Amino acid sequence: MTYENVEDTFFEAFEGKYVRALITGPTEEIVKRAAYDSTSTPSAVIGRVEGGVEKFLDKNETPDGRYGAIVQYWLGGDDVEKFAFELSYRLRQDILVKPFTRIFDYSNNGSEEYVEMMDIVGHCGDGYEWIVEEYGRKMINVPIAVPDFQIEEKFRINEGIMGGNFWYLCESQEAVLNAGRAAIDAIMDVEGAIAPFEICSAASKPETNYPEIGPTTNHVYCPSLKEKLGNDSKVGEGVNYIPEIVINAVDVESMNKALKSGVDVTLDFEGVIGISAGNYDGKLGDKTYNLLDILK
């Protein structure tokens, strides 16, 4: 693989806290709905939780012998209480309500920091919930109308890396969608990595004229503003679309592996004419990583 169409630039990332969980269910459809619903609405940039699907598992790969999905939920910063509060919405409103689902802690390290699930999810049983020991774990059994929902008693909180990214510069809509889908699939083959926005069509910037609504468009990279901005535009010749893939991962090694896998497969597609990344002169993330250093 050659990288002559990759810009020599860096992207910015930052540390974050995450919970890695396993959702199981009786059918692939129920598991996919629970996984995608609970990890939608990436919101870390506005101080809330974002998530992603890491991998789907077959029946023989899960503790209870059912279909499974490994998912991650992330929050920037150190406010564990807020993390638990925000996470509880995802677990209760997107998974508990799906029939016959179950959630396990699926942490990949021995962290001693936990989220206690009884207070934020277990008490959905309104005091009728109880603890059972099944699948080699302590599970909270929550009685519900379609019996019954179970969730592991404690989930470990881990620290990882958020916001790794690359942009793939495209001539056509087909390139945006086809190359992007292939990149997401390649990232899902990397253990410990997720793409919380999947194909992201709206790269943002640290500065904004409207701080009350959070990050706003990175105007100098908007193809529709190229003529209006003139020399201030940073949209290159022949570039009509600039989608972004964002990567969160359990560690820097996994982030780098996922980024390389995504870029490599993207460059194989007709209509992809270059690769760049979100370089904000250090204003967004406190960690910087050179794109070419990772790829070569």
Model-found features: residue ranges?
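Conserved mixed alpha/beta catalytic, RNA-binding, or beta-rich assembly cores of soluble enzyme
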Residues: 2-7, 11-12, 17-57, 73, ...
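Glycine-rich phosphate/pyrophosphate-binding loop regions near the starts of catalytic domains
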Residues: 58-69
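Short Gly/Pro-enriched loop/turn and capping motifs at secondary-structure junctions
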Residues: 251-253
